[in-house]
Regions:
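Rieske [2Fe-2S] iron-sulfur-binding domain
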Residues: 2-90
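C-terminal catalytic domain of Rieske-type non-heme iron oxygenases
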Residues: 74-282
């Protein structure tokens, strides 16, 4: 049975619930957010309305997505300067339903250790499984991960050979996480991937991806295809994790390098009193 979200930090935030282009195909979309049924409709004057059975919700359109909130948003939608770069393919990477907590998806996205095992031939390969030390810090209430280099045989569709790829992560909100990754051609510049995770309920979510890739030697279709291939490799791993909720309960923390991001992320969630989609001490 779906439970009610009482986490003010989550409720008073903006969440993606659909792509704007979906309303070009049908005038009404039914979906869920935090266990609540919501309807997205295009009005006769072309305005977009989002509502539950008992109230109209706030709505914003940004980056080609429809955003709403069940509460009273206290923060703006995140700023993405890369979305304004004319030298980039700026596109949706698609929406995928995953039968696990949205918090699990964020933690998996941050996990360096799985790349060689889950994405061989793309994001890693044996024997290149060593995780060098890296930096994790919290700045302005966001998590930043830097000083990461990982060998990848095919870091993107534009890759012609394997190389050490510079990585950075940024966790903006509990359900919004981005990756900056060295471009395969212009290695001194970064491609950008962000996941906007829509919690259907505590154990199911829809992952909306937004891609800002430098356009050298690649097409929009290739960029989207690559993202979908990688994510479909992750999906069964995520859906087979037990429990589906992310454990935040106190436990002994083994100081393994690849776990450092996870430990910081879980502590950060605890500090924000996040319970929805998590197993906590409370």
């Amino acid at each position: 049975m779906a439970t009610t979200c009482e986490d003010r930090f989550l409720l008073n935030d903006w969440h993606v619930v659909a792509e704007c282009s979906q309303l070009n195909m049908k005038k009404t979309i039914n979906t869920q957010l935090f266990g609540k049924q919501i309807t997205i409709a295009e009005e006769p004057n072309s305005d977009i309305k989002v509502y539950t059975e008992d109230k109209v919700l706030p709505v914003k359109l940004k980056y080609g997505f429809i955003w709403t909130s069940l509460g009273s948003p206290t923060r703006q939608i995140i700023d993405i300067p890369e979305a304004l770069d004319k030298d980039r393919h700026v596109i949706s990477g698609g929406a995928t339903q995953v039968n696990t907590s949205g918090l699990r998806v964020v933690e998996n996205f941050l996990d360096q250790g799985h790349l060689s095992w889950v994405h061989p031939g793309f994001l890693g390969e044996q024997p290149h499984t060593e995780i060098p030390d890296y930096n994790v810090e919290i700045v302005n209430d966001e998590i930043f991960v830097s000083n990461v280099e990982l060998y990848q045989p095919k870091a993107s569709t534009a890759s012609t050979e394997g190389f050490l790829v510079a990585y950075e992560w940024r966790v903006y909100r509990p359900l919004t996480v981005a990756l900056y990754k060295a471009n395969s051609i212009q290695k001194d510049k970064m491609d950008y991937i962000v996941l906007f995770i829509q919690p259907i309920d505590e154990e199911n979510c829809i992952v909306h991806s937004f891609l800002c890739y430098l356009s050298d030697n690649t097409t929009k279709e290739e960029v989207r295809w690559y993202m979908q291939v990688i994510f479909m490799q992750d999906k069964p791993i995520l859906e087979n994790q037990i429990p589906k909720k992310l454990p935040l309960i106190s436990r002994a923390e083994t100081p393994i390098r690849s776990d450092k991001i996870s430990i910081v992320y879980r502590r950060w969630l605890n500090e924000k009193l996040i319970n929805y989609g998590a197993i906590t001490n409370s």
